[in-house]
């Protein structure tokens, strides 16, 4: 049975894991790293994902997309999107349906598509390790993601060629990895501060039962915001000194961003770091190059980002209140996400909860490990684990006067189903529009509109007479479907919520086809590169053999080999893999005659003819050996 993989699709880095026996295991990518940068770069000839994309970001800033998770399921007019527009070097545009998309090299891509490219890399990483095709996955999302963002993540999986068996909340996944082997009853808080999002989740763990009591967070608070504080500080200081605004130069901005991230990481283990960026700009008056050499202390960094850390504590208060527990009731605080390595973050969390956080999990890998455990549960490989998660935000509809009427409150255990009867607002009203919202504000317009649909052909009747039953259904992924039924006529209408905007089935199918076509093109390009490498290697070895042994064969053989070499050299200048393979075949056959002549000459020098020596068996020089399979590299 094919493995179900667990993927942590992160804002800054992504990670893939599987169940290896009874324990989850992170899989290294083709570069040998356990996490992959969530970055996609587009060059003239190819698409790069992960570390190769990150390496070329400085020289190709407009065509390198990072932190796209912050855009997933969002609209162009959103305040957060407008803020990001000013900070990133790539273009954020209207996807045509009001959704925020990115534009690279004249092509528009949805955040789901960009995420799919990263998921494909994770899929390929798992396939290379397992030696078999992977088609199913569990993917994690921030606990505070709304329905539109969850749906968009599921779409990304589909575009990448994966059946997403479950969307699981990141803090819940981390709790699974933390509590898999723990038998005692505990109440834990998972504080998850990642690259782009923040979540706090309160759970009860009791011998394999993981019950989420409450969750809260901020989907626009993370390491990217910390980096931008440093970038703005560096740019301001440079402007004061040289009168040049580096934020207007996309290449300089990308260099600043990389320097800021590096400085932030270094200041987690040292008190001071130096930011050194030579030739970052030019003096407009003198034409002389300008260099940035600046010291940044941990104290200065903490003053720049102190309010961001404090901002994460408000959701912690709300989560404790919703769970009905006090700080003293929390037995363990688990830190998740790369930003929790920052000493000031650890200090503030310790001060808030009144206890030292648990240090036994790797904050970069624990979410992927939890996703793999959930994959194991769904596959039947992991027994005695029951996960009860919650919906992060209240769900309801707009009623008379624009009021938001809740049907399902936040932190309700999922899956769940809830119905309520409504009526018409006017006499003889023959249709109603059901507008579905998600959020905590009292007026519908202040919440997130998830979608709308009409229930028509209601028989004429006085206002308040018709009975319209509205039913909300939330599945285990946290994805919502809504139905409305006229109890008088039995007529009903239902939808699985698609964000106002979002990707239609046709959009997704087109993107799946594009992804498959690109995969085929990538495969052909790789085949061409490998064939060229093979040809170059053959040319080199043949040339060396002629230099060393050309005098041992007749001139006509050397001439035939040199002709074949010339033909292969010409073929290598083309982009035709078939032509190159033909050249390799011809040169291989020609070079074989050289090999035969060399062996004959060496045998003659040794005083024996080939006939005297007798025909050699292919197996003459092969030594039989017994190998013991130690099981270390067995693939399941």
Curated annotation (Swiss-Prot):
Keyword list, A-Z: ATP-binding, Chaperone, Nucleotide-binding, Phosphoprotein, Stress response
Protein induction: By stress conditions e.g. heat shock.
Residues found modified as Phosphothreonine: 197
The keyword Cell cycle belongs to this UniProt entry's keyword annotation: no
GO MF annotations, alphabetized: ATP binding; ATP-dependent protein folding chaperone; unfolded protein binding
Acidic residues biased stretches: 620-630
Superkingdom field: Bacteria
Pfam families the UniProt entry points to: HSP70 (PF00012)
Region span, Disordered: 602-636
Database matches in InterPro entries: ATPase_NBD (IPR043129), Chaperone_DnaK (IPR012725), Heat_shock_70_CS (IPR018181), HSP70_C_sf (IPR029048), HSP70_peptide-bd_sf (IPR029047), Hsp_70_fam (IPR013126)
Role played: Acts as a chaperone.
Family: Belongs to the heat shock protein 70 family.
PANTHER family noted in UniProt: HEAT SHOCK PROTEIN 70KDA
Protein name, as recorded: Chaperone protein DnaK
Gene that encodes it: dnaK
């Amino acid at each position: 049975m094919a493995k179900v993989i667990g993927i942590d699709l992160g804002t800054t880095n992504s990670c893939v894991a599987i169940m290896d026996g009874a324990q989850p295991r992170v899989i290294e990518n083709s570069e040998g790293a356990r996490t992959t940068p969530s970055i996609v770069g587009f060059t003239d000839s190819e698409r790069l994902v992960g570390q190769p994309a990150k390496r070329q970001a400085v020289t190709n800033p407009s065509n390198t997309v990072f932190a796209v998770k912050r855009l997933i399921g969002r609209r162009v007019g959103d305040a957060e999107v407008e803020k990001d527009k000013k900070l990133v070097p790539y273009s954020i545009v209207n996807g045509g349906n009001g959704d925020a998309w990115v534009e690279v090299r004249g092509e528009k891509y949805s955040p789901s598509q960009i995420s799919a490219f990263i998921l494909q890399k994770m899929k390929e990483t798992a396939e290379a390790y397992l030696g078999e095709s992977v088609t199913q996955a569990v993917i994690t999302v921030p606990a505070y993601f709304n329905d539109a963002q969850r749906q968009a993540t599921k779409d990304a999986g589909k575009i990448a060629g994966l059946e997403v068996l479950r969307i699981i909340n990141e803090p819940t996944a981390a709790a699974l990895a933390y509590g898999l082997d723990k038998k005692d009853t505990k109440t834990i808080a998972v504080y998850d501060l990642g690259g782009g999002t923040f979540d706090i989740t309160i759970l009860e763990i009791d011998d394999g039962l993981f019950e989420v009591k409450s969750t809260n967070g901020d989907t626009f608070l993370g390491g990217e915001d910390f980096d931008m504080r440093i970038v703005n500080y560096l740019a301001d200081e440079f402007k004061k000194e040289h009168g040049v605004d580096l934020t207007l130069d996309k290449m300089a901005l990308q260099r600043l961003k990389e320097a800021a991230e590096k400085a932030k990481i270094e200041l987690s283990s040292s008190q001071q770091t130096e930011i050194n960026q030579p030739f970052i700009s030019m003096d407009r008056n003198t034409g002389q190059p300008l260099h940035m050499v600046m010291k940044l202390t941990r104290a200065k960094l903490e003053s720049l980002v102190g309010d961001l850390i404090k901002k994460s504590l408000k959701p912690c208060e709300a989560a404790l209140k919703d769970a009905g527990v006090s700080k003293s009731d929390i037995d363990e605080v688990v830190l998740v996400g790369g930003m929790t390595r920052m000493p000031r973050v650890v200090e503030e969390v310790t001060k808030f909860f009144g206890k030292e956080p648990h240090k036994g999990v790797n904050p970069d890998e624990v979410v992927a490990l939890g996703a793999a455990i959930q994959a194991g549960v769904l596959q039947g490989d992991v027994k005695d684990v029951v996960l009860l998660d919650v919906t992060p935000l209240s769900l309801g509809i707009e009623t008379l006067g624009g009021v938001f009427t809740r049907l399902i409150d936040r932190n309700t255990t999922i899956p769940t189903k809830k119905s309520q009867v409504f009526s018409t607002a006017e006499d003889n009203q023959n249709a109603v529009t059901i507008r579905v919202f998600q959020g905590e504000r009292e007026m519908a317009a202040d919440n997130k509109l998830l979608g709308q649909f009409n229930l028509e052909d209601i028989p004429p009747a006085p206002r308040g007479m018709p009975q319209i039953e509205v039913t909300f259904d939330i599945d285990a992924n946290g994805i919502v479907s809504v139905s409305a039924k006229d109890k008088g006529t039995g007529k009903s209408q239902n939808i699985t919520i698609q964000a106002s905007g979002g990707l239609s089935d046709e959009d997704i199918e087109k993107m799946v086809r594009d992804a498959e076509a690109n995969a085929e093109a990538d495969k052909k390009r790789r085949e061409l590169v490998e064939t060229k490498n093979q040809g170059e290697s053959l040319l080199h070895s043949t040339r060396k053999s002629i230099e060393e042994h050309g005098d041992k064969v007749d001139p006509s053989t050397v001439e035939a080999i040199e002709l074949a070499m010339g033909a292969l050299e010409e073929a290598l200048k083309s982009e035709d893999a078939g032509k190159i393979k033909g050249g390799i075949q011809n040169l291989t056959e020609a070079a074989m005659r050289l090999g035969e002549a060399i062996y004959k000459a060496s045998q003659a020098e040794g005083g024996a003819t080939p006939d005297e020596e007798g025909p050699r068996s292919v197996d003459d020089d092969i030594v039989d050996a017994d190998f013991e399979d130690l099981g270390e590299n067995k693939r399941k």
